[in-house]
Amino acid sequence: MRFHSRILLLITCLLCTAIAFSQVKITGKVVDNSGQPIEFATVRLLGTAVGTNTDTKGDYEMTVPKADTLMVEFSCLGYSTVTRQLIKPEGTVTINPKLYEKTLELEGVEITEYKKQTTGMQGIDVEMLKRTPDASGGSVEAVLTTMAGVSSKNEMSSQYMVRGGSYDENSVYINGIEVYRPQLISSGQQEGMSIINPDMVRKVDFSTGGFSAAYGDRMSSVLDITYREPEAFEGAFAASMQGGSLMLGHSTRHYSQMHGVRYKRNSSLMGSLESKGEYDPQYFDYQTSLVFKPMDKLRIALLGNVSINDYRFTPKNRETSFGTSEDVKQFTVYFDGYEKDKFQTYFGAGSVTYLFNDKGTDLTLQASGYRTDELVAYDIHGEYWLDQAGQELGVGKYHEHERTRLKMNVMDLTLRGNVGINQNSISYGISMRKEDIYDRSRQWQWRDSAGYSLPHIPDQVNVIFTESSSNDLKTTRIAGWLMDTWRFTSGVGYWSLNAGIRLSHWNFNKETLVSPRVSLGFVPERNGNLSLRLSGGVYYQAPFYKEYRQQLLDELGNRTILLNKDIKSQRSIQVILGSDYTFRALDRPFKFTAEAYYKNLSNLIPYEIDNLKLVYSGINSSKGYIAGLDMKLFGQFVEGTDSWISFSLMKTQEDLYGVKVPRPTDQRYSIAMFFTDYFPNIPRLKFSLKGVLSDGLPTTAPHLTRADSYVRQPAYKRVDVGLSYELVGKDNRPLSGFLSHFKEIWLGLDCFNLMDISNVSSYYWVTDVNNIQYAVPNYLTRRQLNVRLSASF
């Protein structure tokens, strides 16, 4: 019996050896012309059914039968097909093909096909950022606000809302590192510039929901930015009526550096606001990105940022007309006082990455630090009149005072890695974050209407509102995640499955969170133009500074801010179903995208929106839901230029103190368009248009909630247009002289708010002696022209 077993084992070994020697393993990485990996590329052996697909790192591996000659084909939608011939291959063969973007020529116009999307992340063309008319000064977020499900209500701000979420529910990453924005910003005038420098951006990925476990505890969206690494000496500069920017980059074999400086003054734009006075805003931003590669498998990267926003305003007067054509009211104010705000942020990060092999196995140790020093200080006194057709409705005085100082330090240490195993890509990480917060604030408001101090108490003179805070806090957060992306091909089509889990703990409230997330993408074999996506999971909004500041009232109505140690993370259980369909119409490519979503919300911390300021209750006292449908048609409406139109329907509601009310972000509909064109006889003259029509948001009077009462703002309507003329380009670049050193030079003219529509950002509430309140709209900017010059070299 033992003899027969040995014979059987010997035969099995011989057969396995024969099979092994009769097969060839083919591995490698598929990249584009810039060296970036291409995911979802098809690798197949011609003449057989053997094939595979690349993973998220562009890597592939397959075993094929041995033959004298093998033909291996590499293809991907939007790229040219490459074929490699192998003559008598043996053992393991490595092929690293480079695919070039596939274009068609129609009368000299290039038309590029569109890639399939099997995950919740969508890519955004960086080139579109350069010539987009943007009143905020040229930000990445300006393009985002035209995407389905994304909206903004203030053209001077780079903040945005996604699918019923607030400004605080969006996370932003630069080179894999989470970045933050100032916390005390309450208006677009104060904000300045986005932390993202568009001149330094190489890649933009954006998710409106259903993102993976690798991203932190936010409920709404992820904006993932990757900065470029210069290939040689290069630079870019821009100047306009709003400000200017300069970027310089340099590269050697083992080292690359990039530096960007931006300066902005919005005086001309703010001059169109109804509050007249001396606006003196100054915004400065410096960023640097350094990369060292002492060896092929080792990469050391440094990222730094200094941002200083200095906003000064001396108001003089304001005249606002509002109401209907048959009921016009006039609000007039004469001011005396001064506002001085300063926001200083400093950010630095360093990472060391070691690449173990060409299969995408790497390990990164990353450390980052963020510091913000914010000051809001104003003393403004005013006398106002409210008239209706010559009849005086109210007259009075008011005084507003605030001194708020916030200092915050956030230190983060992260260890993360990736492991490539066949068709699986495993990602993992663990992080520890320490937060140190210093908060001092005192603010009050006093009003006198028709000679009476409000609130009117005969033997006292009281302010209408007072609030103070004095808090110091040091906390630690720990998080970890593990996820796997599995891409494979079956008889019915191509599949992409991502499943992961994220764990986090915060020592302030002793809360531990478990966040499972999963997404599935499918491209049917019978219809390669169609792709389907299904994603879902449990997402949390971990409280950060503003959310757990709780207001406590004493017997005199004074408010004191305390930190709520019983606060819990807001929770969102999400399900998202989406599809893409690519097609050609008029011999041009188009892609139609539709996504339906539902979010069950619990442990909500109610808040109200005043312009850009979110005022939280500081307690978990609400629950609700968000449901909606997003649609987008993307394509070349004009040959050779990409445009799109998006349409969104959404409903969000919450149970607030026993009353069902719309949430502050209840934007029931939104239509947005980004359109590009060129003049046929002057192809160097480009035209771009950005238009938005979105429903108004519910709002309420100060110190009240929507459970008491609310009004809905008018719809936000805005159209911005821009003309750009190419002075120097790849087809008209001089061979000698000064201009020969430039790659591109563009001269542009923008018209912001083409229709000169007065949009409402918030309301100023006036109360007369009879305690009747009038909502006086605070209008945003009117029509403005902007001239800009940009160049790259």
Please describe what each predicted stretch is:
Residues 293-309, 337-509, 593-596, 644:
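Face-selective signature of the C-terminal outer-membrane beta-barrel domain
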Residues 490-492, 597-600, 617-701:
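Gram-negative outer-membrane beta-barrel transporters
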Residues 317, 525-574, 589, 596-616, ...:
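Surface-exposed extracellular loop regions of Gram-negative outer-membrane beta-barrel proteins
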Residues 362-368, 374-378, 566-620, 625, ...:
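Membrane-embedded beta-barrel scaffold of Gram-negative outer-membrane proteins
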Residues 402, 406, 410-414, 568, ...:
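Outer membrane beta-barrel strand-and-loop segments of large Gram-negative receptors
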Residues 31-34, 41-46, 73-80, 89-133, ...:
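Short, acidic, small-residue-rich periplasmic hinge/interaction motif at the N-terminus
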Residues 692-700, 725-793:
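C-terminal beta-signal and adjacent terminal beta-strands/loops
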Residues 80, 93, 115-170, 176-211, ...:
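Periplasmic N-terminal accessory/gating domains of Gram-negative outer-membrane beta-barrel systems
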